[in-house]
Amino acid sequence: MSNVVVMGAQWGDEGKGKIVDLLTRESDVIVRFQGGNNAGHTVLVGEKQYILHLIPSGILHEGKKCLIGNGVVLDPEVFCREIDSLRAQGVDMSPARLMISRKTHLIMPYHKVLDQAREAHKCKDAKIGTTGRGIGPCYEDKSARIGVRAADLAMPELLRSKIEAALVEKNALFTGLYGQQPLDADAVFEEVMAHGAKLVPYLADVSSEIHDAWAEGRSVLFEGAQGTHLDIDHGTYPFVTSSNTVSGNAAAGSGVPPTKLDRIIAIVKAYTTRVGAGPFPTELDDATGEYLQQKGHEFGATTGRKRRCGWLDAVVLRESVRLNGPTDIALTKLDVLSGLKEISICTAYIYRGEQVAYPPQEQNGMAHVTPVYETIPGWDDDITGCTTWESLPAPVKAYVLRIEEITGVRISLVSVGPERDQTIRR
């Protein structure tokens, strides 16, 4: 039995969906433990592409149980739409194999209105590039102890009272600060309950489900969303998400003790990407950056926004290792680098006149660093057909081993293409 946490080591979009899909074969239960539908996992199965925003990608594997933990914020409308879409494609979406924690907080219609109004109201330099999905405002209400939880859907009077109380404050903001029309409490209640009727059968005690699985000797895979450097505490604040994306939150966001987590896999893209605003020291605003963007199909699964591209940043990776304690690394999109004569790796920053090995912790400090690069030979070979470590060209292996050396973490999986079987185990 193995309990594995999969988390992103950069700014998200590292290719977690494919790796989770691969590891799901070896797991019995898959748990999503944080974030909301601001993240998207793209999974390619044969000729069919699935984009999942809330439901764990393990749902595509027959016989696997998928759980949504208390650390997630869930939009009932999006959840119901995702269920309908997957069911239409022949996926079993019964409550016996998909469950939501009763403690999971719900993204309400007023959260989305507030998120979008707040971002639109900011001056250009203050915008953080939110997806406008209501994630942040939902987490705000959770911390303020005024949020709506999934269990409230089964208690209509409690739900109605929470909505009415929330709109006293939210409508004051909408009308007084943002010039928006107020929301009607009855209309919000009816909208939420319409989706809630479909959602209630999926409610469960997720913590107990996981512990029961362990008691039966089954293995659990904890599926993270986004990436370490979008973490609310440890990321490039304020250009971050509203939850903890580091491996430690797998326990808190699922209702299990951290001593049960025995393997942590950090997903690392072979180059670096970022969506939206925020510092990006190794960003390439040139032909090489465009090459990576086009060849890597770097468009956000959730927003469709073009991802910014740059060289691999080992400073960021060192910090990720320090924060997450990974047992091993899965390196993705290595095939995208084929065709480049030289490849650069950022091994340090110059910050305030000194060379540093870790990111500065001051707000906006990352915007004022100069990357220090080392350059190694690239390769022209098409590696998408390679199936073993030995079959990879020497320059490819040298690049992988250099990343391993810099991070001090073994690279156990190397992805050389989007398909499930285009993955090399070491």
From Swiss-Prot:
CDD domains: AdSS (cd03108). Its cofactor is Mg(2+). Belongs to the adenylosuccinate synthetase family. The keyword GTP-binding applies. One of its GO terms (molecular function) is adenylosuccinate synthase activity. Pathway: Purine metabolism; AMP biosynthesis via de novo pathway; AMP from IMP: step 1/2. Keywords: Cytoplasm, GTP-binding, Ligase, Magnesium, Metal-binding, Nucleotide-binding, Purine biosynthesis. It comes from the Bacteria. GO terms for cellular component: cytoplasm. The active site is at D13, H41. It is an enzyme of class 6 (ligase). Mg(2+) binds at D13, G40. The keyword Nucleotide-binding applies. InterPro entries: Adenylosuccin_syn_GTP-bd, Adenylosuccin_syn_Lys_AS, Adenylosuccinate_synth_dom1, Adenylosuccinate_synth_dom2, Adenylosuccinate_synth_dom3, Adenylosuccinate_synthetase, P-loop_NTPase. This is Adenylosuccinate synthetase. Homodimer. Its EC number is 6.3.4.4. GO terms for biological process: 'de novo' AMP biosynthetic process; IMP metabolic process. It is found in: Cytoplasm. Substrate binds at A301, T302, T303, G304, R305, K306, R307.
